């Protein structure tokens, strides 16, 4: 699109939205009607920076796009510009609430600029600002995500194996065998990485019955806030905090949703083991069932408790102790 025609004074604080794609990105200014675009590379970054140098920037919001946003966000941060990388679902829901029902790169960029204006006026603005991920943590995140991809592929191939075309089984079995080797190799790499960079935390977490290497890796990789935030906040980030659904005199059923699915899934698998072998979680689970809670609700509550225990251990540096952590709410 053409250059924005939005005119501002020299002292006007402006809010920028950036919509990222693999090859290009589009940016817009809150209150403008048009956007600009550039290639997603250093030359394109310089085009954006040239525009920003003419402005007094209050906040730049970039939609998280599978890591495509990291390079630009890091460049902006190094130059001292305030940057927030936001959840795509939150950004889209905000856009719809503002009446942006259609979806194009330009519309998204302007909607993100509007979102930047809103976020900048929140009391806890510091909580949304981007901070670069350390290289060793970024590497662990990449390995954990890759393992999930391989596991999903293996599940898909296993399901295909049960199909009616027996002539395909040899091919499917060969793919499964290759995937098994890839997963085993990646498990060793993840274990070595945890040993090198997260040894103490890894040991503390894996001392908890139910928490294995894969759960530990997912939690360490995608919950770096553990130990620095309250348990309730951790539960909200993962999507394990029951959220109210009330309106007027209606008191709806509370439910959990959203959050970091890769951590939530890992904790759920750990919970299935913990309700059998971890004395603290087992007693808690049985008490919930005795109180009439459905199994799914009880399991979710156990995952919530397990996360709070991990958060408390990360904060205190204490080893797993059933007598202490059994009272963690």
Per-segment meaning from a language model:
Residues 1-13, 35, 47, 56, ...:
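Intrinsically disordered, low-complexity and often Lys/Arg-enriched segments
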Residues 2, 74-77, 84-209, 217:
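Long, charge-rich intrinsically disordered scaffolds of nucleic-acid metabolism proteins
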Residues 290-323:
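Charged substrate- and nucleic-acid-binding regions of tRNA-handling and nucleotidyl-transfer enzymes
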Residues 6-30, 112, 150, 217:
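Gly/Thr-rich phosphate-binding beta-strand-loop-beta motif of the actin/hexokinase/Hsp70
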Residues 30-59:
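Nucleic-acid-processing active sites and adjacent nucleic-acid-binding tracks
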Residues 213, 217-291, 295, 322-329:
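Phosphate-backbone recognition surface of nucleic-acid-processing proteins
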Residues 57-68:
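Short glycine-rich phosphate-binding loop at a beta-alpha junction
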